[in-house]
Structures are given as C-alpha cells and as structure tokens.
Regions:
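Feature 926 captures the class I aminoacyl-tRNA synthetase adenylation module centered on the KMSKS loop
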Residues: 1-23, 48-303
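Extended amphipathic secondary-structure runs
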Residues: 17-36
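Short, solvent-exposed helix-loop connector elements
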Residues: 38-46
C-alpha cells in the first residue's frame, strides 16, 4: 500500500536519482547501522563520508607504494631493524584495534567493528603515523628507513585483512599489491588469508607515553601559532626549554606544525613580546618578529 507513496516521495527527494557511492562504502554504511534496530533512516551524507574513507585508504596505499616499491622494506630478517617510538606506537595501536574488532564480531556488533577500523585507519595510521613516517624516511639512517618501510607495509597489509569482511572489493584490489611487499602473500586471495589476531606482547607502554607527549607538543605549538596570529604559510623557529628526553620528539615538529626548526635550549631567548606556552613541564617559544605598532592597532580594533 505504501510502496507508491514511497516511490513518489523518493522521486521528489532525488529527482536526478540516488547518487552512486560504491559497494564498499554502502557495505560500511550498513555495518555502521547494525545496532540501530530494524528501522534505519539511511543517511546519504554518512555513505558519502564512508566513500571518502575508501578514497583515504586508496590514497594512503598509493603513498606507501611510492615509498616502498623497489626499496628495502625490511623483510630480510638478517638485516638490522631500529623501531622508533612511532613505529612501536602504531604497532601497539594495531593490536588494540585487532582485539576490539575481534570482540565486536564475536558479539555481532558490526557497528563497533566499523567504528574501530574507521578511527584506527583515518585518525591513527593516516593522520598520525604516515606523517611521522615521512620524517623518518626523509631524515633517518638506512636502518630507520628500512624499519619505517617495514612498519608501513605490514600495518597496511593487516589493515586490509581487518577491513575485508566489510569492504571486500577495494581491500582485495589493494592487498594483491601490498601483500608481496609485506612478505604476506600466503594465498591467492585476501579472503583465504588468515584473519589478524592481536598480540598484546607488541604493545609498548613507553611508546604510547612518548606519542602522547608528542601530541601534546603539537597541540601547544598550534595554539601558540593561533594566539600569535601566525599565518599557515609562515614558518617560524621553535625554542624548547626542557629535559633532554624531548630531543627525540622535536624532529617531528617542523613538518607537523610548519616550523623552520625545533631546538632544545637550556634557557629560552629573551623576547619580552613573545608568549610562552608550558607543556608537561617544558616551556615553548615561537621566535617571530612582531610589528608592535601593527599588533597594537589590531588589538585596539578588536577591543
């Protein structure tokens, strides 16, 4: 009885037809709705967001391939490896994601599995680890570069296997290229490969602590830039007064926060007009020459 009314309303709502989102994006959307009951108010914006997620995964894979194909990816176990805290952090987060996804599938909470995978891939692997890996590949020694490439491809290959039950098409396509680089081509198809299982022994708490400290530093530097009104295209030097333990974190800041350099000093330089931020006991200062007259005029205008 309601079918004609639904058809008429749908035609009015989508006069040009329903836009194509792709099978994987549709499957991921339906998985995210799994716990909402029998009635689902389908949100096309949500499906569009998961289509963007597919694009994000594709672009991340392209980056990994550009930096690993025909290069030493650390699959020769006889070669030395040097895992940084960033490598250990993403490997540890992967174990947590694997455990959470396994529990979600066991309890038929496909929505939680989808949410866990989305957050890990987008927020942790793409937004954080890939950016840190760029620094390690550009500035690290050959052993660090080898280890970074190994981590990039092995984590990505595991991501593809984790995602496969929900997004079978894009993961199959990408896995055929990524798996050989990770020395993980154990079957002709990803659907025949073993599903990932968490190994809690690979979770290193000190790496988590260092990553949390780095995130705090990045947040404070970005706040400083905002407070000082520094344009996104302007780079400035950062001076940090703090413990020697910060030295290993500072090399990541220039690329993450658009700095010319990040330097650890015994005492901050004298600059009466430069604001100072405090982060976990460290004092941070961006050294930027400020036009005092222009700044005074701006503040007066805002007041």
């Amino acid at each position: 009885e309601t079918a004609p009314k639904v058809e008429e309303a749908t035609k009015k709502l989508f006069p040009e037809g329903i836009p194509s989102m792709g099978a994987d994006a549709l499957r991921f959307t339906m998985a995210s709705y799994a716990s909402l009951g029998r009635s689902v108010n389908f949100d096309f914006k949500r499906a569009e967001g998961y289509r963007n997620f597919c694009n994000k995964l594709w672009n991340a894979t392209n980056f990994v391939l550009m930096n690993t194909e025909d290069k030493d990816c650390g699959q020769d176990e006889m070669q030395p490896l040097a895992f940084t805290f960033a490598d250990q952090w993403i490997i540890g987060k992967l174990q947590q994601a694997e455990a959470a996804v396994a529990e979600a599938f066991e309890t038929y909470r496909f929505d939680l599995a989808a949410q866990t995978l989305y957050e890990f891939v987008w927020n942790e692997y793409c937004d954080w680890y890939i950016e840190l890996a760029k620094v390690q590949i550009q500035t690290g020694c050959p052993t660090t570069q080898r280890t970074t490439r190994r981590t990039l491809v092995r984590v990505l290959e595991t991501i593809l296997r984790l995602l496969h039950p929900i997004m079978p098409f894009i993961t199959e396509e990408l896995w055929q290229v990524v798996a050989p680089l990770a020395n993980a081509k154990t079957a002709d198809s990803i659907m025949l490969a073993a599903y990932p299982q968490a190994d809690k022994e690979k979770i290193v708490q000190t790496a988590f602590d260092k990553m949390a400290a780095l995130k705090d530093l990045v947040e404070e530097v970005r706040k400083l830039r905002g407070e000082m009104g520094i344009a996104p295209n302007v780079k400035a030097p950062l001076f940090v007064e703090g413990s020697a333990e910060l030295e290993g974190l500072l090399k990541y800041l220039p690329s993450l926060t658009r700095l010319t350099e990040a330097k650890l000093v015994d005492n901050l330089p004298e600059a009466e007009d430069a604001p100072v931020a405090v982060c976990n006991g460290a004092r941070l200062m961006l050294k930027v020459e400020i036009d005092k007259a222009a700044e005074t005029a701006r503040l007066s205008k805002e007041a």
